[in-house]
Amino acid sequence: MATLRQGVNRNIGRILGTLRAEWQQLYNRYFGHIEHLEGDAKEICEQIVDRLWEGDFYRTSLGHFDFFWMRDFGTVAESLVKTGHKKHVLHTLKWALLQYRNSATVTTCIDKSGNCFNAPMHAVDTLPWLLHCLVVSDYDLNKSERKFLEHELRKYCRRYLDTTGHVRPIEFAEMRDAVI
């Protein structure tokens, strides 16, 4: 159960994170420039991965989505581990779990300041992607992280799954890349 402080922080984080994302998107669309990187495909990929490392976490983009998105990180975590970036993957997960515990919920996004928010809204795949990342990175949960995730799993089952284990017919964010 979230404390009053956590609830206030969560709401402030949600508002600030969403406003920042929208501002960055508009600014980059109309005033940004396209950067070109030198090298072959492998060298360009290495430059991008290195530049996405924020010091505490992997951000999703060099552009306007320059904060942590659980879904995007989940899709690349295994590849990052296999290409020698396991240390940064583990550090990202530790950082994300700390932010999630501080806000008392798992969300789709976390900004640089640690504000957790759902953009554009809650998503049914956020917690599963987090669990996937923990497995593929062989992350060793501490006691408080395990307790937090057990609570989040119970909350997830109540919110998203019916008594048969199927996803409830409710509205939630979807992966826009999959929409034709």
Residue spans for each PLM region:
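Aromatic-rich carbohydrate-recognition surfaces in CAZymes
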Residues: 66-73, 77-165, 175-179
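Low-complexity, Ser/Thr/Pro/Gly-enriched N-terminal "stalk/linker" regions
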Residues: 2-68, 90-91, 95
